[in-house]
């Protein structure tokens, strides 16, 4: 329908065995429909043959979301509490590009977004598709950084690397650029911000509540991947305590659910360690 939000909500177990079943053909079909202004979001159900990778792929191609519904509570969250954000976009093709000042930052690492990476030249190319943001929702990008001159650097400095020249950028840690399109627009809008000491929290405790909780969630994700990149002492308990300290009002109980997930994951991790070769009896 013209001048309306057109979105297909696909409920599936991810086993596409009727109609288009070839992954590449399916992705191409979704991409063509996206160009006509039709969004696609995927809600996954079932166990056993559940195909999460395929669902994530076509949802990204269709500028939508992919969620797994395993409980009545999750269904209520997706189809009631978060419905507006899951259906109505407020920004299309949102791109973030961060340039770190080598005079202040020796190393950096983006946590997550492995399937959303763009080439540097794609940032200014409005023809390159990117993610969308729904009404009432927000997106957080977390970078792990090592200050210049720190003993914690994991790699040696570049022999021929050129440090940033002193001047107007001396007090900057990074320069953030954000591009987005208004829904239906062909050209993007650019927003920039220089990150300085004014943006820095002096300690973890003084950081905003949302930032502390987001860090706990990122740490949880890293632990699920093995935790090899996490520092000593930042394990399940530290992640849980960080989340507890930033739980806030938690109107719908989502943060409390996350904290409970850390307990369940810690228990499962301990059980797996006992049954692994060379562990336990």
What kind of region is each of these model predictions?
Residues 13-17, 47, 73, 101-103, ...:
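Short, glycine-/Ser/Thr-/acidic-enriched flexible segments
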Residues 105, 113-139, 145-281:
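Long, acidic serine/threonine- and proline-rich intrinsically disordered regions
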Residues 1-94, 153-166, 249, 259-272, ...:
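Exposed acidic/Ser/Thr-rich ligand/metal-binding surfaces
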Residues 5, 30, 34, 54, ...:
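Amphipathic, alpha-helical segments enriched in basic
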Residues 10-12, 42-44, 98-100, 143-147, ...:
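Flexible glycine-/small-residue-rich
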Residues 39, 61-138, 144:
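Polar, glycine-rich mid-to-C-terminal structural blocks
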Residues 1, 9, 61-65, 98, ...:
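A broadly tuned preference for mixed-charge, low-complexity surface segments
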